[in-house]
Amino acid sequence: MNISIISIGKLKEKYLKQGIAEYLKRLSAYAKVEVIELPDEKAPENLSEAEMLIVKEKEGIRILDKISDDTHVIALAIEGKQKSSEEFAVSLDRLATYGKSKVAFVIGGSLGLSSEVIKRSNESLSFSKMTLPHQLMRLVLLEQVYRAFRINRGEPYHK
């Protein structure tokens, strides 16, 4: 399985970079995983609704440029479906079973994802109803993907 994590914004925090590197190393035994980091759109603090839409649309174009037609796209969004680790593992296993060798998880910038990215997505996933920093979501997502592979193979780790 080829997994892409497509995210908006440059990761600056060393501790997040270290955690991501660790999970990418662990995941290399199970799948080819790449993190695609796209630049965020510079925007002032107090944006109007129209300006927010423009920012999301520009970031959305960058995201869509990285997704091929044969990729199963999972958008990370607060309004997405919440799953347990076991349910998530089953979802990934089903994708592999039914020939979806390319999977892309999409993490938007601080304003979220454009409507075009949501439309292109095959499903939407939420890790919480709480708002989480999009930089932190990369690490949380990679940990859950790793956990899913361990669950699916019956290997110790998941508790």
Curated annotation (Swiss-Prot):
Name of the protein this chain belongs to: Ribosomal RNA large subunit methyltransferase H
Cellular component aspect of the GO annotation: cytoplasm
Pfam families associated with the record: SPOUT_MTase
Self-association and partners: Homodimer.
Domain of life: Bacteria
Catalytic activity: pseudouridine(1915) in 23S rRNA + S-adenosyl-L-methionine = N(3)-methylpseudouridine(1915) in 23S rRNA + S-adenosyl-L-homocysteine + H(+)
Species whose genome carries this gene: Bacillus cereus (strain ATCC 10987 / NRS 248)
Role of this protein: Specifically methylates the pseudouridine at position 1915 (m3Psi1915) in 23S rRNA.
